[in-house]
């Protein structure tokens, strides 16, 4: 597993490099647009690019503590936490896929519905996080404390990924208008 995690970190670094190159190319293209259009689009372009960067940073903030945990041979994740996070992961994947589809096709007819569902999901993630904090505070077992912190970080970063998705989707819609 450590090699998979290391590979994932390298892939995120490569994505960051690609994103930086893409950003430079887009900025050059914006300079060629009429000034009034460029000014308005520039704002939404930067909001969208910042959200893209937040995806990368968020994934790295998820991955690095997990990699450290695995590298140091700490306690494996419990089946209970796996079962709890699996539907969360699937929902995140679904939201990101839907957002990608809106952006790739430029069709934003039902985007408001996705934003509303994502906002509700952020609230659910906040509840998961609060419940997990309560579990940490109630636990008598110091052996699982580090694992609990890694999982808490995963929940927090998951919430931030959804927030970034919402910002990016709004920015993409405004950019296309």
Give, region by region, the residue ranges found by the protein language model.
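Cytosolic, long alpha-helical scaffolding segments
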Residues: 1-177
């Amino acid at each position: 597993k450590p090699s998979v995690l290391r590979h994932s970190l390298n892939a995120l670094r490569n994505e960051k490099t690609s994103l930086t190159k893409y950003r430079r190319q887009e900025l050059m293209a914006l300079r060629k647009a009429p000034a009034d259009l460029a000014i308005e689009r520039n704002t939404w372009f930067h909001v969208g690019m910042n959200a893209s960067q937040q995806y990368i940073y968020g994934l790295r903030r998820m991955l690095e503590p997990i990699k450290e945990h695995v590298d140091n041979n700490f306690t494996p994740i419990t089946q209970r936490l796996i079962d709890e996070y699996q539907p969360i992961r699937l929902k995140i994947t679904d939201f990101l896929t839907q957002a990608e589809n809106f952006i790739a096709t430029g069709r934003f007819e039902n985007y408001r519905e996705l934003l509303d569902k994502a906002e509700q999901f952020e609230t659910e993630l906040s509840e998961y996080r609060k419940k997990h904090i309560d579990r940490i505070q109630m636990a008598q077992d110091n052996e699982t404390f580090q694992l609990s912190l890694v999982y808490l970080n995963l929940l927090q970063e998951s919430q931030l990924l959804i927030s970034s998705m919402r910002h990016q989707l709004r920015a993409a819609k405004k950019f296309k208008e």
